[in-house]
Amino acid sequence: MSANVPEMLDAWRMVAARRRFDGRIPLSAMTRLQGSLVDTDGECVYSLQFDQDPLLKVAYVELSIDVELPLACQRSLQRFLYPVQIRQRLGLIRDEADEAALPAEYEALLVPEDGMLRAVDMVEDELVLSVPVAPVAPVAPGSEAIDAEWVPTQEEQDKASPFAALAALKKQ
């Protein structure tokens, strides 16, 4: 994790001070995410901006994440880099009942009683949610479009339909 980002952040003090933190986290430091990755090569670039909405009086942290996750393509079983760019505004709430009061554009983040948050956990939570169930590389070998139009040959067209006999019986 970056040297200028404390491991634990007091959410309410950060909101009052309108603090911003920019950091980097190696993928190897995110233990819950590792099971979804092919390997842990690379790092995640993120920023946290604590603030309060002046009109709605909602305390929030704006989370920005840029990373390329090494995933296994489910078509080719080859490693590929899945680009992830997240811009999420998390409304800070003290109690689950406060979630209903949040505007639609805010995602709720329940702050523990002591007010302390871990930046790594917030970033990792969003990355775990961003991993697709069945990742597919955008240009995986063998994933090219197949010609959907099938034109029958003349021989097939000339052959009598097996249903023609049924049609004749139906007319009788």
Annotated model-derived regions:
Residues M1-R18, E43-V45, L81-Q172:
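Charge-rich, low-complexity linker and terminal segments
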Residues L77:
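Cys/His-coordinated zinc-binding microdomains
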